[in-house]
Amino acid sequence: MERIASFCVDHTRLDRGMYLSRQDGDVLTWDIRMKKPNHGDYLSTGAAHTLEHLFATYARNSQYKDGVVYVGPMGCRTGFYLLTRGLTPAEALRLTVESFRFMAAFEGDVPGASEVECGNYRDMDLPAAKAEAAAMLPLLEALTADDLHY
């Protein structure tokens, strides 16, 4: 079998940030790396799950909603993938920054966190999710579209 593209990224050199991971036709895959790989600090499952619900809800209700294909966590718990169509790198970055601001400040019930709406609704940790989003925000806010490469 061929090695998939995400396994071709040298994780020993990868740091926190936002990167264009790949382009498949008109779909761009963004690597939103919240944790340095293999350094022992990972997103907890509760924080990652909560961030997933908040990020997906915000992105799919934003001005960029028609360009959002998918938002989801990495299995290694070091970040998220954002798949977009028709958004420029600057727009994808703006969407990500706005999403992280939303998540860092979120108060209330986590969207989709009920037995009817989610397959593991009890595994949520809003305080941890907010802290993780707040910790990532300064890094994202300092980026420009020209910085979004490995």
Indicate where each model-derived feature is located.
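Short, low-order "capping/linker" segments at domain edges
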Residues: G119-D146
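Short amphipathic alpha-helical signal-transduction/dimerization elements
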Residues: A56-Q63, F100, A104
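Conserved short beta-strand edge segments in small beta-sheet-based binding/regulatory domains
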Residues: A104-C118
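Non-catalytic beta-strand/loop surface segments
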Residues: M1-T29, R60-P73, R77-Y81, M136
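Active/ligand-binding-proximal structured segments within catalytic/core domains
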Residues: V27-N61, Y70-V71
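Sequence termini and other peripheral, non-core segments
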Residues: L148-Y150
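M16 family metallopeptidases and their MPP-like homologs
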Residues: V68-R101
